[in-house]
């Protein structure tokens, strides 16, 4: 697992009036809790699937995302991002990590500066089984890797990618692969935060066990469909998915 991590901080409370200083809401914070986000959220989801997983990441205290939630409506009032970028990963760290010895590599590239194009190219040459979730607009640095992006990210690509390696998630519709749409489980969407992390974690883990990308996509859809039922980053377990499939 390689990628940027952050600390997700959730403030829950209420908005009960508009400020007299400016036309903005006044938020009264009542509770605050933290979760790991981005690459560390992917990492935790892989571990939940009983798959061993090492991680190379930045300090999770550097990038922070603070969300302010009105508990009466379970709705986000606003989000505060602090330190929205980080220093590049040193290629020497990767060289010492013996990436070729791993069964697979997941790259969670939020395009915050940790994974430069040079670093991405190094990773791509280091293993034959690599799954990438990237917000870069030029994905040519990930040649030969499986790429998982969403519809918006696909529309912003500046260069074509190999369709045999491209999976496009489409929210409640499911995931598109080789012009086939694999549907998601119908589910009440409460919060999409972290759903992409769940998908890439499951996609990689199930592919290791099945060597079947289509079957892995279908299973990943199921897990992601469960994750959106909960607020914030959520670690999905197998029992929850089985219950969702039965219902």
Predicted regions and their residues:
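A secondary-structure boundary/capping signal
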Residues: 2-3, 150
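Short beta-strand/turn micro-motifs composed of small residues
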Residues: 3, 47, 57, 134, ...
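Active-site metal-binding loops of divalent metal-dependent hydrolases
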Residues: 4-5, 110, 198
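Conserved beta-alpha-beta core of the PfkB/ribokinase-like small-molecule kinase fold
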Residues: 18, 22, 68-83, 104-160, ...
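Catalytic cores of large soluble enzymes that bind and process phosphate-bearing ligands
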Residues: 31-34, 38, 111-115, 146, ...
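Conserved phosphate-binding/catalytic region of the ribokinase-like
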Residues: 101, 118-129, 134-141, 156-247
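Conserved N-terminal subdomain of the carbohydrate kinase-like
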Residues: 7-104, 234-247
């Amino acid at each position: 697992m390689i990628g940027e991590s952050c600390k997700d901080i959730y403030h829950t409370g209420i908005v009960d009036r508009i400020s007299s200083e400016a036309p903005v809401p006044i938020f009264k914070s009542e509770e605050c809790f933290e979760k790991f986000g981005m690459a560390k959220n992917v990492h935790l989801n892989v571990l939940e699937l009983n798959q061993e997983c090492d991680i190379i990441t930045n300090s999770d205290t550097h990038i922070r995302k603070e969300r302010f939630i009105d508990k009466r409506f379970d709705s986000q009032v606003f989000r505060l991002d602090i330190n929205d970028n980080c220093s590049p990963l040193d290629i020497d760290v990767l060289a010492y990590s013996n990436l070729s010895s791993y069964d697979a590599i997941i790259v969670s590239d939020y395009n915050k500066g940790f994974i430069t194009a040079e670093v991405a190219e190094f990773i791509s040459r280091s293993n034959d089984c690599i799954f990438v979730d990237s917000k870069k607009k030029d994905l040519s640095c990930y040649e030969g890797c499986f790429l998982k992006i969403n519809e918006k990210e696909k529309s912003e690509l500046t260069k074509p990618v190999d369709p045999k390696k491209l999976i496009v998630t489409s929210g409640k519709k499911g995931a598109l692969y080789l012009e086939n749409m694999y549907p998601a489980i119908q589910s009440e969407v409460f919060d999409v935060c972290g759903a992409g992390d769940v998908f890439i974690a499951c996609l990689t883990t199930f592919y290791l066990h099945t060597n079947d990308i289509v079957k892995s996509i279908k299973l990943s859809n199921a897990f992601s469909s469960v994750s959106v039922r909960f607020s914030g980053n959520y670690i999905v377990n197998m029992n929850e998915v089985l219950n969702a499939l039965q219902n």
